[in-house]
Amino acid sequence: LLINMLAAYYDINNADRFKELFGEQWIYEHPTSLRAKFMILRFNFSAVNSTPGKLEESFEEHCTGRLVEFADKYEHLFQPGFRQELMSRTTASTRLDYINSTASRLRLRIYLLIDEYDNFTNTILSTFGKDEYRKATHGEGFFRYFFNVLKFLTSGNGMALERMFITGVSPITLDDVTSGFNIRTNI
């Protein structure tokens, strides 16, 4: 519910619907300067298959699906051919980088929402053990690399990815994949 509310509040596509969405709420009378200023990119990693051998492909498919939804929802803010160019990239990380660099050039803002960031890693740890868990979250593991890309995409002035809200159950995965991810605050 919180992630849905954040998405509705910050989504640039909801600028004309603020009263409809929040008219009876305290926030309607006390809006922040950032309301309806972001394109919203959402992931829910509970949809990722945690079975070894299927994990990375499932992660890529989930991310690609969400990136396509993002492109469809906000294509009107980008140049013609944006979606096609996005799909010419081969991985979730390169697609995310393309979205960020293109949005940055256009001075658009992105708010990234990740629900259950640790769902599949907790399942791996409890079901398949530490070795399988480490493959995804340590060294050159794909999930660790994904968080390295997120950090990179927030580094520097004028980057479109300005905000992230990430939920999970356990700090274990966050500690393992976010070494050096000093752009976060636990709440």
Residue map of PLM features:
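Phosphate-binding site recognition
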Residues: L1-I187
